[in-house]
Amino acid sequence: MKNNLYVFFLFFITGLMSCSHHSGLYEHAEKIMSQHPDSVLTLLSTIQDVNDLSEKDRAMYYLLLTEAEDKTYKKHESDSLIAIATEYFDKTDDVKRKAKAWYYRGRVVDDLKDAPRAQDYYLKALQNEMEITDYAFLGRLYNSIGMLYTYQEVYEKAVLYQKKALYCFEALYDSIGQSYVLRDIGRNMTALNKMDSAIFYYEKALYFCDQKSKSSVYRELANLYLDIDNYSKGLEYIEKVLSSPLKKSMLDSFYFVLGKYYQKTNQVDSAYYYLGYSSNSSRLQTQAAAYYHLAQLERFRENWKGYANNQIRYE
């Protein structure tokens, strides 16, 4: 009932405005964007013909539309509309909207798996970095750049930007933002083989995680400790996962860690069972890791045919 009244209110205030004056509508949309992006989409849908808008209003429309779609997890298919916003705001002194336009253009092409263009657009969003005072926006921007570098396996640069994101989220006392960034820094430190640093960031992430997110960090810490042959600590975090709410989508990756623990502690039958289960995962990374450890089991048994078969599947 409350949501219906809210949408009615949006239509009401829209009706009070003439088609030639949209600034009030856009300002209201910006104010409610963080909490009600779905309502922003409803509000924007009341604008009849976007092509009749002024250049500025059209740029604002496409910026708000792209931002609201991004915040409601709608799949981006083209950057042609947000390009109208970047083209307009790049000619202005509106630092905040210029940065946002480039950021959301980067988000769109990031969705389209075009990493070089995404990187270019994200960095353009930072062209007036020192003048941007919106820490929530800066935190998201830095984090997006960090994630992009992570996917490209440029881990040192990823950590650099993720630490900047962390600073922003700390300034805002944003526990959710801090928990995700700390976890991601932990992952990149693991990739850099800086295990002590990885443990530090993972354990710090646990301080900010909600109960549902902790099981994922516990699992990653368990896997890390197994990699450095600290089986007692690995088991400690495995037990923490078992005592936490476990999402069905996490079963494959958790069973892989469990199988890896049994393989490393020579509990062969259990290792075969859990690694075999995780080798059927829909995630290629989990599949490959499971086949690698199944190959090691066969190598230990000197079953060279089984070793070769699993090694081929791993590679």
What are the functions of these language-model segments?
Residues 2-10:
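Sec-dependent signal peptide recognition
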Residues 15-18:
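C-terminal motif of bacterial Sec signal peptides marking the signal peptidase cleavage site
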Residues 21, 53-60, 77, 91, ...:
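Residues that mark the junctions of alpha-helical repeat units in TPR/alpha-solenoid scaffolds
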Residues 23-50, 55, 76-79, 119, ...:
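Hydrophobic positions within repeat-based interaction scaffolds
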Residues 45-50, 83-93, 124-133, 163-174, ...:
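Amphipathic alpha-helical segments of tetratricopeptide repeats
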Residues 55-58, 75, 95, 115, ...:
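Inter-repeat boundary and helix-capping residues of tandem alpha-helical solenoids
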Residues 62-68, 81, 98-109, 121, ...:
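TPR/Sel1-like alpha-solenoid repeat signature
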